[in-house]
C-alpha cells in the first residue's frame, strides 16, 4: 500500500486536497502485482503569482518515480503529475516484463493492467507514450577536462546544452552541471 507524506509550502493542506492527492496517485497501485509498501513524498508549494508546484517522489525497491509540475490550478497540476508518474510506471513495466520474458523468468514487478481510459487532462507538454525499446541514436566520446563548476556552466552555455559533464578540479571526481526548469543551475557530484 502506498502511504502519503504530504507537505504544503505557503499552503495549508486541507482534507479535500489530501483526499484528491491520495485518490489520484493511489491509482498507481493497480500497476503492481504486489502493491509495494512505499511512501509517496508529496510537496505542494504556492508562489506569490498563484502558481502551484507539485513534486512527487516515490522511492521503490528498484526504481524511484519522480514527477514535478507547475500549474495555475492545483487540481490540474495534480492530474498532470499523476499522468507523468503513470507514464513512468508503464515504461518501467514494459522494460522489466520484456527483460523477464527474454530470460524465461516470471514477470516480477508489474502486472498487466486493463487499460483504463486516460483521464481528461490537456497536457500539451506530454511525453510520447512510446513503450518500445530504448534506442540510442547517437553516441559520443570525449575526454573530461578539469575545471570548476562556474567554468562548466560557461562551457554548457557556449555549447547551448542543458547539461555539461566535467572533472571537478578540486575533488578530481566526475560532476555534471545542468540547467533547471526555473532557469537556475544544478550540480551533481559523484562519490566513490
Swiss-Prot record:
Q: Name one GO cellular component term.
A: cytosolic small ribosomal subunit
Cite the GO molecular-function annotations of the record. Answer: ribosomal small subunit binding
Pfam (any one): Ribosomal_S30AE
UniProt keyword annotation of Manganese present: no
- CDD domains from the entry? RaiA
In what ranges is there compositional bias, type Acidic residues? 120-129
What is known about what this protein does?
Answer: Required for dimerization of active 70S ribosomes into 100S ribosomes in stationary phase; 100S ribosomes are translationally inactive and sometimes present during exponential growth.
- The protein's assembly and partners: Interacts with 100S ribosomes.
Supply the name of the protein. Ribosome hibernation promotion factor
Q: What is the lineage of its organism?
A: Bacteria, Bacillati, Bacillota, Bacilli, Bacillales
Q: Which gene encodes it?
A: hpf
Amino acid at each position: 500500500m502506498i502511504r502519503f507524506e504530504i507537505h504544503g509550502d505557503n499552503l495549508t493542506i486541507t482534507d479535500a486536497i489530501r483526499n484528491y492527492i491520495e485518490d489520484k496517485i493511489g491509482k498507481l497501485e493497480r500497476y503492481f502485482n504486489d502493491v509495494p509498501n512505499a511512501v509517496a513524498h508529496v510537496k505542494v508549494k504556492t508562489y506569490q503569482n498563484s502558481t502551484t508546484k507539485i513534486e512527487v517522489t516515490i522511492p521503490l525497491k528498484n526504481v524511484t518515480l519522480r514527477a514535478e509540475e507547475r500549474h495555475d490550478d492545483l487540481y490540474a497540476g495534480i492530474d498532470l503529475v499523476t499522468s507523468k508518474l503513470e507514464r513512468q510506471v508503464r515504461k518501467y513495466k514494459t522494460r522489466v516484463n520484456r527483460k523477464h520474458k527474454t530470460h524465461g523468468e516470471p514477470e516480477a514487478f508489474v502486472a498487466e493492467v486493463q487499460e483504463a481510459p486516460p483521464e481528461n487532462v490537456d497536457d500539451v507538454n506530454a511525453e510520447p507514450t512510446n513503450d518500445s525499446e530504448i534506442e540510442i541514436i547517437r553516441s559520443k566520446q570525449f575526454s573530461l577536462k578539469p575545471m570548476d563548476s562556474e567554468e562548466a556552466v560557461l562551457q554548457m552555455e557556449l555549447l547551448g546544452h542543458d547539461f555539461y559533464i566535467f572533472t571537478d578540479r578540486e575533488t578530481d571526481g566526475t560532476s555534471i552541471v545542468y540547467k533547471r526548469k526555473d532557469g537556475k543551475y544544478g550540480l551533481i557530484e559523484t562519490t566513490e
